[in-house]
Structure formats: C-alpha cells, structure tokens
Amino acid sequence: MTRVKRGYVARRHRNRILALTSGFQGAHSKLFRTANQQGMKALTYAYRDRANCKRDFRRLWITRINAAARENQITYNNMIHSLYMNQIHLNRKILAQIAALDKDCFVEILRIIK
C-alpha cells in the first residue's frame, strides 16, 4: 500500500482548528490535540446554551411582569389568564418591556383586563 502524506490538507485542517480556538488560554490555543478537544467542547457548550438563553430570558420576563403586576394588586397568573380571556395577544417579552419602560401603559392594560 502506498504512503499518503496528505501534504497541505493536514496543515490546513490543523490551522483551521487552531484558528477556531485562537482566543483560548494556554495550551488550549497552541497545541493541536488539546485545541481540538476544547474546540469540540466549546461547540457543545454553544449548542446547549442557545437553548438555555431562551429559557433564561423567558424566566426574566416573567419575573419582571410579576413584579409590575403585584404593584397593581394582581398576580402574574391571574394577569396572563385575564389577557387570554380578553383575547389580548401580547407576548411576555413585550409585556416585560412595557412594564419596565411605560408604567402608564401597563396600568392601562391591567385596567382593561380587570
């Protein structure tokens, strides 16, 4: 069987991996084997945290809405239920922004659903 040296293909592969990990500390950006492992781990974390980010933001929005609603003597649960019953279609992101930036508008929404 003939020997395959791979030439520039192997070097290009290694350089691509090292470029991916260029901001990492120590051997994780210098040595190919550890850089390759850390690069795969980084991609795994990125995939996982894309879902976690959505989860965390939804939790933050709910907390902000609940805090603003309780200032007006209504719980988050009752408020969301009343919004659906009155067919007011505002998502949690928009409600949280209204609660934080425009208190008068938020109070008006609560007045409509009570």
From Swiss-Prot:
Protein's organism: Psilotum nudum
Record-level Gene Ontology MF annotations: rRNA binding; structural constituent of ribosome
GO CC term, one of those recorded: ribonucleoprotein complex
Main location as per UniProt: plastid
Keyword set includes tRNA-binding: no
Protein name from the UniProt record: Large ribosomal subunit protein bL20c
Cellular compartment(s): Plastid, Chloroplast
GO biological process: ribosomal large subunit assembly; translation
Annotated gene: rpl20
Family: Belongs to the bacterial ribosomal protein bL20 family.
Keyword Iron: no
Residues annotated as transmembrane: none
